[in-house]
Amino acid sequence: MKKKNIYSIRKLGVGIASVTLGTLLISGGVTPAANAAQHDEAQQNAFYQVLNMPNLNADQRNGFIQSLKDDPSQSANVLGEAQKLNDSQAPKADAQQNNFNKDQQSAFYEILNMPNLNEAQRNGFIQSLKDDPSQSTNVLGEAKKLNESQAPKADNNFNKEQQNAFYEILNMPNLNEEQRNGFIQSLKDDPSQSANLLSEAKKLNESQAPKADNKFNKEQQNAFYEILHLPNLNEEQRNGFIQSLKDDPSQSANLLAEAKKLNDAQAPKADNKFNKEQQNAFYEILHLPNLTEEQRNGFIQSLKDDPSVSKEILAEAKKLNDAQAPKEEDNNKPGKEDNNKPGKEDNNKPGKEDNNKPGKEDNNKPGKEDGNKPGKEDNKKPGKEDGNKPGKEDNKKPGKEDGNKPGKEDGNKPGKEDGNGVHVVKPGDTVNDIAKANGTTADKIAADNKLADKNMIKPGQELVVDKKQPANHADANKAQALPETGEENPFIGTTVFGGLSLALGAALLAGRRREL
């Protein structure tokens, strides 16, 4: 078995050796042809790479291609040399920006600003810069030559004389636009005629100057000023009159008269003017403490828009002011639960059981059976002139205008009098309210206090008030009726007292009789 395997291996080895020998013989027979094919392939590859090397110039590229043609067997060496030269000529990284080096950037800028190149020429040079930045200096030199060759001749340049003529013509006030543009165009067409054109323009300007009687004289200036300050003209009307004044100053007086007539015709009607009622509403709304600025401005604008509804606007403003009043409990604010507000259960309120109220059974009330009661034989009986006598004007008399008077608000409300006849104005007070509360007139208060306008008062202001006695004492007599019992004073009180006295006397007599 082993012999058989050895024999097989030997046969395999002989076969391999034979194949190898045959291959070598065949290869040796075709070597020149294979080498030629390899050279052609290397040459083609070198051609392609050299053509696409961006940093070779045309001469260098053509030289390498010629070398490849002359000796294809040296293609690898030629390609290596070309690559080395291409790399050495590559722009440095710190000088690049999209492969545009410093020379290229400078050339770009200069070519873009050459005034005598047309667009096609300028674009052509720029494209050349992009294609081969290494030729920037050469491209720029060529562009400069072309620019200079196309420059206008010296006799067509805008010289100093022409520039001066331009400036003067532009500032001639009496030329119209058409005339001015005509002279400027002539200067552009033939700068050599600048002096003549300027002289001609000056003559025309002077001939068109306004005559002395058409200049802006004093009458025109006055009309200008007055028309500018006519309050009832709109902008279009005002501008129209002013333009007419400019066009023909000799008509200044007529134009001013016409403007005044139109201004008067457009004046607000009398019923729309700020009347006295409106002024009063203005003042009060400005002093309502609980309104915001936006609310106050809104009410004032409404007053301006329609003064005829001043009362309604004021009432609405007051209602809003009261609704926005702070909720803190104090003694001076209307609408709060305090000791001075009418309609509340406190010691000073009318209609409550207190020591100062008329019609109440207390020590100072008429009709009360006490030391101050009418009908009692003492120093405080009715008819005696003392501080507690019914009908006397004191601080506790029914019907007296004081801080505890029925139907009046407390000492911090309008209408309160003090002992000196001075009223301190509170927020929301008006002269009419104060006069009504004190039994006098608004005109009287205005005269006594020397008020220029009786509606112009402010909180904290002290007003002298001329107090008057009530015309009748009906209130005092009414107060003598006791609403709870129906008894009247002093007659009923006297009768009761007399009856008690008679009963006491009868009892004493009966006692003595029994003793006897």
From Swiss-Prot:
Pentaglycyl murein peptidoglycan amidated threonine: modified positions: 485
Localization of this protein: Secreted, Cell wall; Secreted
Keyword Signal: yes
11 X 8 AA approximate tandem repeats: region residues: 333-420
Keyword Secreted in record: yes
Region spans: Disordered: 318-440, 467-487
One matching Pfam family: Octapeptide
Sample GO molecular function, one term: IgG binding
Induction of synthesis: More protein is secreted in a secG or double secG/secY2 mutant (at protein level).
Domain called LysM: residue spans: 421-465
Biotechnology: Important immunodiagnostic reagent because of its ability to bind the Fab and Fc fragments of a wide range of mammalian immunoglobulins.
One cellular-component annotation, GO: extracellular region
Immunoglobulin-binding region A repeats: 154-211
Immunoglobulin-binding region D repeats: 93-153
Leader peptide range in chain numbering: 1-36
Residue ranges of Immunoglobulin-binding region C repeats: 270-327
Composition bias, Basic and acidic residues: 318-420
Phenotype of the disrupted gene, per the record: Decreased virulence in mice. Bacteria do not bind IgG. No visible phenotype during growth in liquid culture.
Keyword terms of this UniProt record: Cell wall, IgG-binding protein, Peptidoglycan-anchor, Repeat, Secreted, Signal, Virulence
Membrane topology per record: Peptidoglycan-anchor
Sequence repeat residues: 333-340, 341-348, 349-356, 357-364, 365-372, 373-380, 381-388, 389-396, 397-404, 405-412, 413-420
Function: Plays a role in the inhibition of the host innate and adaptive immune responses. Possesses five immunoglobulin-binding domains that capture both the fragment crystallizable region (Fc region) and the Fab region (part of Ig that identifies antigen) of immunoglobulins. In turn, Staphylococcus aureus is protected from phagocytic killing via inhibition of Ig Fc region. In addition, the host elicited B-cell response is prevented due to a decrease of antibody-secreting cell proliferation that enter the bone marrow, thereby decreasing long-term antibody production.
Quaternary structure and interacting proteins, as annotated: Interacts with host TNFRSF1A; this interaction leads to the stimulation of both surface expression and shedding of TNFRSF1A.
Domain notes from UniProt: Each of the immunoglobulin-binding region repeats can bind the Fc region of an immunoglobulin. Cell wall anchoring is conferred by the LPXTG motif and following sequences (residues 482-516) which are necessary and sufficient to target other proteins to the cell wall. The YSIRK-G/S motif in the signal sequence plays a role in the secretion efficiency for SpA, it may have a specialized recognition mode.
Family per record: Belongs to the immunoglobulin-binding protein SpA family.
Protein name: Immunoglobulin G-binding protein A
